[in-house]
Every structure is written in C-alpha cells, then in structure tokens.
Curated annotation (Swiss-Prot):
CDD domains: HomoserineK_II. It catalyses: L-homoserine + ATP = O-phospho-L-homoserine + ADP + H(+). It is an enzyme of class 2 (transferase). The gene is thrB. Pfam families: APH (PF01636). InterPro entries: Aminoglycoside_PTrfase, Homoserine_kinase_II, Kinase-like_dom_sf, Pseudomonas-type_ThrB. GO terms for biological process: threonine biosynthetic process. Its EC number is 2.7.1.39. Belongs to the pseudomonas-type ThrB family. This is Homoserine kinase. Coiled coil: none annotated. PANTHER family: AMINOGLYCOSIDE PHOSPHOTRANSFERASE DOMAIN-CONTAINING PROTEIN, AMINOGLYCOSIDE PHOSPHOTRANSFERASE DOMAIN-CONTAINING PROTEIN-RELATED.
Length: 332
C-alpha cells in the first residue's frame, strides 16, 4: 500500500461529510506496498483505513467490498467496509473509487513461527469454506491471462537466463491451466496475496493456552475467484520460507498445511499438483515484481519489492517440492 493520490485536509473534510464517524483526530499515509493509496484514519468513533483505488474500477470494486462484508458475517476476521450516508460502500475521491474500512487489532508478524502458521492455516481454510456461497464472481486478475499479457513487456529488461525461465515456466503453467486435473481443483473466492504483512496477530487472552491470537486478514484488493490450492501455495511461499534462499521451512510448512487440512482436507487432484501450484504462486509474484520494478508508476511514497526473491523461490520449487502432508482429521 502506497500513496499515489494526495488527500488534503479540505479534501478529507469534504469526504467525511458522507460518513457518520465523528470528528477526525489523525490522518496519515501508509507507505508500504505498490497498488493503492492508503491512509490510517482515526476519529472520535474509532480507527479506520481509507483506501483510494488506483487501478480497480467502480464496476470491479463491489466484488471486493461485498466479499469482505460476507466473510465478516461468517465470523472470519477481516476489515468491514463502512457504509456512506447513502448506503453505498464506496464513493469517488479525486475521481477515483475510495472506501473506508474498519482497522483490525494487532500487528504483523514478520518472523513467524510454527504457532503463527497454524493460526493462518486454519483461518485460511475457514475463509475458503465461508466463501462458498458468495454470489459475486470476479476472476483473479493477476492469473495466467495477465502473465501472458505482461511478460513480453518485461523481457527486454532481464538477462537471457531469466528470459528462458520466464518463458519456459509460462508454457508449463499454460499447459497446467488447460488440463482436466486443473479444471477439477476446488475453487472459490481467494485472498491471492496473503503475505505476512497482510495478517495481524494480537496477544492471546490469559488462560486460553495459546501464545498468539490471529487478529485478522486484510488487503483483499487482489482477491478473486481462483483455485483454493493457489491461495494455499501463495501463503506457504511467503510464510514458510527462508527469506535468503527461498527454501521451504519444513516445520512451518507442515504446521500450516496440517492446520488447513483439519478444516478442509485436500483432494487427490490437489495432492498431485501441489508442486505445479507452488510454482504458479511463485511465478505470479515474480512477474508482478519484475513489472513493478522495471515499469514503475510515479508515487509520493513507493518501496518496490525485490524481484529476485521470487525468482529464487521459483527455481527452488522447480528443483524441490515435498508432498502435501497426510492428515486423517477433519472438522468444521
């Protein structure tokens, strides 16, 4: 989350007239990320996040905001969009769609342990099942068609070895996506970007027997209807890796995957294609980071991510991928 669109005090005062959130006490930009303009907003009624959507259109936005409301109604801890005085969940600010959502409690855990991965795995499975009856449809906009469209623009900037990997993996993924097994994979609304910095943890209540409590998932603006296994792969590729090498941490990966399976067991097709999907998850973020690194947009506050991180992860997943762990327990 970065700041591409500035909001002055007078802009904010005019905007807040459409909400019943009391008086503004504090307002500041959030510098991390690369997609939308985000601001922390504190009022006499509580703490919120204001987002100006730089790419998503007014036609696309209801999928994301309504999904968050749907998940919140199913007791999945996510930010809840705040209705305006006309009942709408978003309006226009500087001609761009914008919304206010509740701010979750807690802080990101950037050095997660096994206990954090257990919490994330269970909640991710709960989120997938909670989304089964969500009515709106929106594909993952950063999936295969987006890769095919944008890889040619990246190629002039990279080495021959990187180009060979980028193009060979694109061909591999295109064949996988066209297969009958891929079509049979369970699907539904997915977060598609569940990195460490998009999950909050709070201290667990005394006497619960737990050291950590998951505060919630946020930043759903890359969400889309996709294969659930893709969502799991994206999550594992961030939560369960050695950041220097991209190698999977077996203890954390097993903890997350076993916890997920206690809520939703994996199918036979998912087990067969775990390696392919881990590669897909790594490829998606390698492509997007290459694009953002070499073809950036101007922004007031912008911190581009290192594309090499996901190149290392992709090469590692091609070389080594353990099977999904077995489990014999399921609950809801």
């Amino acid at each position: 989350m970065a700041v591409f669109t500035a909001v002055s005090d007078s802009d904010l005062a005019q905007w807040m007239r459409h909400y019943e959130l009391g008086d503004v006490l504090a307002f500041r930009g959030i510098p991390s990320g690369i997609e939308n303009s985000n601001f922390f907003l504190t009022t006499t009624r509580g703490e919120y996040v204001l987002t100006i959507f730089e790419k998503l259109t007014a036609e696309q936005l209801p999928f994301y905001l309504d999904l968050m409301r749907h998940l919140a109604s199913h007791r999945v801890p996510v930010p809840d969009p705040v209705p305006r005085d006309d009942g709408a969940l978003f309006g226009l600010l500087h001609g761009k769609p914008a919304a206010i959502v509740t701010k979750l409690d807690g802080a990101a855990e950037l050095a997660p342990g096994v206990e954090h991965c257990i919490e994330v795995g269970q909640m991710l499975a709960r989120m997938h099942l909670a989304g089964r009856d969500y009515a709106r449809q929106q594909p993952n906009l950063r999936s295969l068609p987006w890769w095919q469209e944008n890889v040619p623009a990246i190629v002039p900037f990279i080495s021959d070895a990187q180009r060979a990997l980028l193009e060979s993996e694109l061909a591999h993924q295109a064949a996988f996506f066209a297969s009958d097994d891929y079509a049979a994979l369970p699907s539904g609304p997915c977060h598609c970007d569940l990195f460490r910095d998009n999950v909050l943890f709070a201290h667990a209540a005394p006497g619960t027997g737990h050291d950590v409590r998951l505060g919630g998932f946020f930043d759903f603006y890359f969400a889309g209807c996709d294969k659930w296994l893709f969502d799991v792969a994206v999550t594992v590729n961030d939560w369960c890796v050695d950041l220097a090498t991209g190698v999977l941490d077996t203890a954390r990966a097993d903890a997350l995957l076993r916890a997920y399976q206690t809520v939703r067991p994996f199918t036979a097709e998912e087990r067969r294609h775990w390696s392919d999907m881990l590669r897909a998850g790594a490829y998606r973020f390698w492509v997007s980071r290459l694009y953002d690194f070499y073809l950036p947009r101007a922004a007031e506050m912008l911190k581009p991510h290192d594309p090499g991180h996901f190149e290392r992860i992709l090469r590692e997943r091609i070389a080594h991928t353990p099977a999904l762990p077995e489990t014999h327990t399921a609950c809801n």
